[in-house]
């Protein structure tokens, strides 16, 4: 009887031993694979996004656009990125100057969206040859851009109805690995329309971005970044809705100051908006439906420019900022 019990027990012991070996192998190697993914792909990419406030000099002649195009290109925050997303590069001469100044560091560049169909692999959306303004977004890269498309939003709000605003999509190859980047600029609240309408238009535009991603059929093991001036203030109800609309998550950490548009510290805003509260409007997200690094952080860089001056109506104005927005950098623990 005892012999029979021992024989019956042997398969159970063997089964438990085999399970233990499998468990150890699986989770031991999973940990190794997880570390490799973070260290090599996709966890080795750094992006900076900056709204550079290069409005048309025909409308705003006194904001030092040409001079700031030189200062921005020389700024420390522009160095050592994999990719830079530019917003509000509207003025044709100033944006050309900025892009040319950046070309040595970032030889691979898109045109400014909405200015022309030339230089793009594909143009989608509501592009108009009669728009009074382009979309102001461009992407520059250290690494080869193997695909670039521009998409013009179906609907704009307020003054944006006169422009070709939308987003730039690029596929970049870094060391043989693909990285997908969408740079965009959704509309700010506008006195010509209600805040509810502005919010609804931003939501529609974010849905257009997700529709574009779905149609691209990008492999699930490749990473997608979405960045730019989204004009959604941190911590609001709209901020939380944005995660679902774009299918993104909040960065693990927000480092630096908690404002990208701040009249209390920015010399270009103090006179125009002396009573306005600071806002956090610019972000760089990782899309949830595809590859993700182990951690992703956003940091606002409250960096100051060398002093520059302009004259208007016989008065000299001096500033010490690159733009009315501060740049944001997105990075992993490996950067």
UniProtKB/Swiss-Prot annotation:
<dbReference type="InterPro" id="IPR036691">
    <property type="entry name" value="Endo/exonu/phosph_ase_sf"/>
</dbReference>
<dbReference type="InterPro" id="IPR017766">
    <property type="entry name" value="Sphingomyelinase/PLipase_C"/>
</dbReference>
<keyword id="KW-0204">Cytolysis</keyword>
<dbReference type="GO" id="GO:0031640">
    <property type="term" value="P:killing of cells of another organism"/>
</dbReference>
<keyword id="KW-0732">Signal</keyword>
<keyword id="KW-0964">Secreted</keyword>
<comment type="function">
    <text>Virulence factor that promotes intracellular proliferation by mediating the disruption of the phagocytic vacuole and the release of bacteria into the host cell cytosol. May act in concert with the phospholipases PlcA and PlcB and the hemolysin hly to mediate efficient escape from the vacuole.</text>
</comment>
<dbReference type="InterPro" id="IPR005135">
    <property type="entry name" value="Endo/exonuclease/phosphatase"/>
</dbReference>
<dbReference type="Pfam" id="PF03372">
    <property type="entry name" value="Exo_endo_phos"/>
</dbReference>
<comment type="similarity">
    <text>Belongs to the neutral sphingomyelinase family.</text>
</comment>
<keyword id="KW-0378">Hydrolase</keyword>
<dbReference type="GO" id="GO:0005576">
    <property type="term" value="C:extracellular region"/>
</dbReference>
<dbReference type="GO" id="GO:0004767">
    <property type="term" value="F:sphingomyelin phosphodiesterase activity"/>
</dbReference>
<protein>
    <recommendedName>
        <fullName>Sphingomyelinase C</fullName>
        <ecNumber>3.1.4.12</ecNumber>
    </recommendedName>
</protein>
<feature type="signal peptide">
    <location>
        <begin position="1"/>
        <end position="28"/>
    </location>
</feature>
<keyword id="KW-0354">Hemolysis</keyword>
<dbReference type="InterPro" id="IPR038772">
    <property type="entry name" value="Sph/SMPD2-like"/>
</dbReference>
<keyword id="KW-0843">Virulence</keyword>
């Amino acid at each position: 009887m005892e012999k029979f019990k021992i024989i019956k027990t042997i398969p159970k012991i063997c089964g438990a031993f085999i399970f233990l070996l499998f468990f150890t192998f699986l989770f031991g190697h999973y940990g190794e694979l997880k570390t490799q993914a973070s260290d090599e792909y996709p966890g080795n990419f750094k992006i900076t996004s900056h709204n550079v406030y290069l409005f048309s000099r025909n409308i705003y002649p006194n904001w030092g656009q040409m001079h700031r195009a030189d200062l921005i290109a020389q700024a420390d925050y522009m160095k050592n990125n994999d990719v830079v997303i530019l917003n509000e590069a509207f003025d044709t001469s100033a944006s050309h100057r900025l892009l040319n100044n950046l070309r040595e560091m970032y030889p691979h560049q898109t045109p400014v969206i909405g200015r022309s169909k030339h230089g793009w692999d594909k143009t989608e959306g509501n592009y108009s040859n009669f728009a009074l303004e382009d979309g102001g977004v461009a992407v520059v890269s250290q690494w080869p851009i193997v695909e670039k498309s521009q998409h013009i939003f179906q609907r704009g709000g307020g003054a944006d109805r006169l422009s070709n605003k939308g987003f730039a999509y690029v596929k970049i190859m870094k060391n043989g690995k693909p990285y997908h980047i969408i740079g965009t600029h959704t509309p700010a609240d506008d006195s010509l329309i209600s805040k509810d309408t502005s919010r609804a238009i931003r939501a529609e535009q974010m849905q257009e971005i997700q529709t574009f991603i779905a149609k691209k059929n990008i492999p699930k093991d490749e990473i997608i970044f979405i960045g730019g001036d989204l004009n959604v203030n941190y911590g609001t109800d709209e901020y939380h809705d944005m995660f679902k609309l774009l299918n993104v998550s909040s960065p693990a950490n927000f480092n630096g100051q908690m404002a990208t548009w701040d009249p209390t510290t920015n010399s270009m805003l103090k006179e125009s908006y002396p009573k306005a509260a600071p806002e956090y409007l610019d972000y760089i997200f990782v899309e949830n439906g595809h590859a993700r690094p182990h951690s992703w952080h956003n940091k606002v860089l409250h960096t100051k420019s060398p002093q520059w001056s302009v004259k208007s109506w016989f008065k000299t104005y001096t500033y010490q900022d690159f733009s009315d927005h501060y740049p944001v950098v997105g990075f992993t623990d490996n950067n």
